């Protein structure tokens, strides 16, 4: 039954359904090629033949070829490779929300400290991932960078232009260069509009639509994201979740932006569909030279697609570095706790490894702890952690970390 979507299908798969057979200790699979593939390690989300092949003419590669491709240059750009240049710079970004009391006048009685002094750079053709627990300020950071929320203080520069001081009129041409892909493909598309009109809407808003070229551009955008242009007159409810997200990506690409801000673009999709969207994003980045600011809580997605990773806790970045730095050499206790919750695809190692269980609840952003914000849940906390907020700086561990007692601990160990 999986044959129509399988990259390794061959003639026998058409005529005979495979039986569920043992391929290892406590491991069974219903596949005619299980014996060939049992020793080929394929990571989740790795690009496969199915992503690039022409199904009409191509033949499936032999498992040995597939293994060689996997063990070779599977990703287009190694983690930590210098990018082409800085396209966006965020410095000491702060966003506080007023808390108002009850009554008729509703005086302000406090502030919610959603984002507090966040700084990072985004380079051309780079993917920067923001990770952290729900409520840590990831989405608020993205909305403030996009100027959908007015920053309390701080700077957001895009190609040497300061965005926080621009008027709505001046921001209009700049918004064409920074587009957004939303989390929920069911809520981000107007159910009353055909998907072709949804994709064309940015072109019409920014006066870039022409009767002659417009339909061709929309058709090309559909092909670019793997959709059939003949379906552009259908409505969103006629598409699956993955197809709707592809429509959202096509809409974001309509104005030929340089930066895509993506707020958990695959979290609402099934795992099998997530892989296709992630591979599509990588292909588009390589083809168009895009820069991504990716917000996600799925650490496996972040590890696959991101060049650099920033870990947020209660409105602050506590650790930032290349993908390999953060995943292989985590330094901040909070990063180590997050990574310890990631399942390891090895039953023996998974049973032997120790989880880092955090005690207590996440403090309220209305009244954050003094000093280090993580100290109320940290097993290393000492007096200095209560008195002094650690700066995000390189402390001899190879990448910046905001901790008074940084220590590299390999959490994701495999055999």
Regions found by a protein language model. Name each.
Residues 1-87, 100-106, 322-415:
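Charged, flexible cofactor/metal-binding loops and thiol motifs
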Residues 154-162, 174:
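Conserved ABC transporter NBD signature motif
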Residues 162, 213-230, 339-340:
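Conserved ABC ATPase "signature" region
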Residues 258-261, 265-351:
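P-loop NTP-binding/switch modules centered on Walker-like glycine-rich loops
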Residues 235-239, 243:
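Conserved ABC ATPase signature
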Residues 146:
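Helix-to-loop junction immediately C-terminal to a conserved catalytic motif
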């Amino acid at each position: 039954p999986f044959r129509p979507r399988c990259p390794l299908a061959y003639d026998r798969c058409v005529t005979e359904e495979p039986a569920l057979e043992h391929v290892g200790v406590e491991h069974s699979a219903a596949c005619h090629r299980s014996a060939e593939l049992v020793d080929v390690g394929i990571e989740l989300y790795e690009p496969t033949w199915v992503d690039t092949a022409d199904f009409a003419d191509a033949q499936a590669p032999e498992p040995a070829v597939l293994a060689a491709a996997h063990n070779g240059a599977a990703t287009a750009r190694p983690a930590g490779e210098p990018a082409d240049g800085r396209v966006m710079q965020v410095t000491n970004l702060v966003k506080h929300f007023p808390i108002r009391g009850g009554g008729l006048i509703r005086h302000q009685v406090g502030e919610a400290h959603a984002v507090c002094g966040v700084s990072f750079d985004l380079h051309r053709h780079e993917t920067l991932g923001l990770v952290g627990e729900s409520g840590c300020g990831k989405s608020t950071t993205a909305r403030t960078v996009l100027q959908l929320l007015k920053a309390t203080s701080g700077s957001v520069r895009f190609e040497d232009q300061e965005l926080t001081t621009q008027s709505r009129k001046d921001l209009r041409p700049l918004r064409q260069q920074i587009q957004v892909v939303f989390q929920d493909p069911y809520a981000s598309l107007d159910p009353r509009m055909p998907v072709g009109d949804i994709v064309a809407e940015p072109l019409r808003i920014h006066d870039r639509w022409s009767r002659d070229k417009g339909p061709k551009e929309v058709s090309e955008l559909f092909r670019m994201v793997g959709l059939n242009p003949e379906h552009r007159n259908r409505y969103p409810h006629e598409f699956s979740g993955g197809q709707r997200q592809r429509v959202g990506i096509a809409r974001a690409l309509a104005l030929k932006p340089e930066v895509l801000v993506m707020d958990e673009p695959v979290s609402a999709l099934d795992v099998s569909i997530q892989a296709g969207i992630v591979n599509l994003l990588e292909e588009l980045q390589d083809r168009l030279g895009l820069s991504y600011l990716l917000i996600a809580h799925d650490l496996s997605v972040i590890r696959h697609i991101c060049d650099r990773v920033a870990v947020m806790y209660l409105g602050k970045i506590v650790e930032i570095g290349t993908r390999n730095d953060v995943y292989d050499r985590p330094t901040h206790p909070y990063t180590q706790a997050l990574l310890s919750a990631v399942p390891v695809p090895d039953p023996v190692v998974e049973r032997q490894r120790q989880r880092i269980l955090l005690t207590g609840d996440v403090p309220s952003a209305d009244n954050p702890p003094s000093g280090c914000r993580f100290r109320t849940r940290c097993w290393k906390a000492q007096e200095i952690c209560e008195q002094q907020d650690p700066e995000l700086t390189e402390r001899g561990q190879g990448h910046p970390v905001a901790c008074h007692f940084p220590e590299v601990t390999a959490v994701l160990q495999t055999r």
